């Protein structure tokens, strides 16, 4: 049952994290008559611009997080980022609040150690070989055992922040310092992963709903140092490998529980499926679904958490390409005229108040009968958007 926003019978969502993904979540929730409250650590974040109201707090601070939850008394608490005090979410859940998909899922997936041990040691899923290190000396020993090249990541970070590739022993200290600079939360622990020479990597968007688990078509993507640059859908997979990928995705999402969409990242190597990571929320590579699917990942997420049926069918092949800033500018302006002239192409600007060098400020979305054509068009569109 959904009531009327701003009245006593309203269904209320409290969104923790108000970036570009959260913005689309709120837009979809608004379409279904849900009252939306956005929370982030800075003013005028993208999702705040489309919410009924917002709060600026440090979501890692237990007292601040508890205060805003108790003030708003939401029906659903929807984490959109990792930088949240998940211990407080677990406490609030025991007090009767509903955390999406569950507080335990939010806690496990913000911590690479927790989710990796769950996937590998409890569920027996194949992963890259890994070790954890809590000091530079421990890291050096771990690298020796894993081998070079290898990947170093903070156990708590997002969007590839702090991730680097060690190509020689001379890179280890630099990678350690970089990981420490980007960690979210307390501590400096990192994960050391073997370098997987995969054939390709995909995101398998997996929707857990009251009507069962559904899988979107595989999304291919390119990440540079863990940061999404482009994605496309569908990525071709043979039926047996796709079935294996769906089996892996179902195992990990069933273990996490709750309803909503999960972005399951997988490496494919010689038709073997290797688990990488999972996010219990819409995934940045899934922005392509805004033009490729009958329902975007954002609509699927909102409908799933409201107990409504979803449609994961593909409408058109398509691609996305990130628009990044090359300047530092407060309140930037965008020239999108030429990009908007390209066939079957849409530009989505996130509305971030500050442009920073390398920061994602928007995305180009293109459809075509052939994925490769869509990829070329989206890349061209993104590259001709001018940020001033």
Swiss-Prot record:
Residues given in the record as N(1)-(5-phospho-beta-D-ribosyl)glycinamide binding sites: 20-21, 80, 284, 352, 359-360
GO terms of molecular function: ATP binding; magnesium ion binding; phosphoribosylglycinamide formyltransferase 2 activity; phosphoribosylglycinamide formyltransferase activity
Start and end residues of each ATP-grasp domain: 117-306
Gene Ontology terms describing biological process: 'de novo' IMP biosynthetic process
One cellular component (GO) term of this entry: cytosol
Pathway: Purine metabolism; IMP biosynthesis via de novo pathway; N(2)-formyl-N(1)-(5-phospho-D-ribosyl)glycinamide from N(1)-(5-phospho-D-ribosyl)glycinamide (formate route): step 1/1
Alphabetized UniProt keyword annotations: ATP-binding, Ligase, Magnesium, Metal-binding, Nucleotide-binding, Purine biosynthesis
Residues the record lists as binding ATP: 112, 153, 158-163, 193-196, 201
SUPFAM superfamilies in the cross-refs: Glutathione synthetase ATP-binding domain-like (SSF56059), PreATP-grasp domain (SSF52440), Rudiment single hybrid motif (SSF51246)
InterPro entries attached to this UniProt entry: ATP-grasp, ATP-grasp_carboxylate-amine, ATP_grasp_subdomain_1, PreATP-grasp_dom_sf, PurT, PurT/PurK_preATP-grasp, PurT_C, Rudment_hybrid_motif
Function: Involved in the de novo purine biosynthesis. Catalyzes the transfer of formate to 5-phospho-ribosyl-glycinamide (GAR), producing 5-phospho-ribosyl-N-formylglycinamide (FGAR). Formate is provided by PurU via hydrolysis of 10-formyl-tetrahydrofolate.
Subunit structure comment from the entry: Homodimer.
Similarity field: Belongs to the PurK/PurT family.
HAMAP family reported for this sequence: PurT
Protein name as catalogued: Formate-dependent phosphoribosylglycinamide formyltransferase
Gene: purT
